[in-house]
Amino acid sequence: MTHITGTLYIISAPSGAGKTSLVKALMDAQQEPQHGAQAKIRVSVSHTTRAMRPGEVDGVNYNFVDRAEFVRMIEHGDFLEQAEVFGNLYGTSQSHLQQTLDEGHDLILEIDWQGARQVRTQMPQARSIFILPPSQQALRQRLTNRGQDSDEIIEARMREAVSEMSHYNEYEYVVVNDDFAGALEDLKSIFRANRLTQQHQQEQYSELFQELLA
């Protein structure tokens, strides 16, 4: 039987653009009966020194560790990429990522542009997607509606968002989240199209191709 390796998808977005909600909706959609055996997308769980927010679960949303443990993991070469954002450290486990891909699962990696650069250097075959808000005003409103941050933090996030968005042209695909349902369909289309590339189809249907051309 042909071994099929999964595809790594890097997804980046400024805080408040809707990345987390879109990825969750994508994961929920693949559980629908019509997707059947094609339901093989996984989401990478990053390590972070950030404090856990209400409703988050350790090992599900993030692997929460203290700074000393994170630094130890860096020294041991455990991370494929790591970055510091708003004073918090984030990193992706190299061994878990490779194991998931080797098992044939597509893997979503939600990281910022700094981490994306690091990953693309080591894994140039990864697909990359950038999610944009429809406007700065809409982004500010979304951050305010969260009710999680002070005005000062929101201003800092807006400044960071502009910096983050300036790197959109480093990505293969861009999704503008002006309508959630439409943005979700755009995201699904990227995954569907990638599964139809010649390379992917050759991996999946190698025996069929040999038979057809015999």
Curated annotation (Swiss-Prot):
It catalyses: GMP + ATP = GDP + ADP. Keywords: ATP-binding, Cytoplasm, Kinase, Nucleotide-binding, Transferase. Its EC number is 2.7.4.8. It is found in: Cytoplasm. One of its GO terms (molecular function) is ATP binding. InterPro entries: GK/Ca_channel_bsu (IPR008145), Guanylate_kin-like_dom (IPR008144), Guanylate_kinase (IPR017665), Guanylate_kinase_CS (IPR020590), P-loop_NTPase (IPR027417). GO terms for cellular component: cytosol. Belongs to the guanylate kinase family. This is Guanylate kinase.
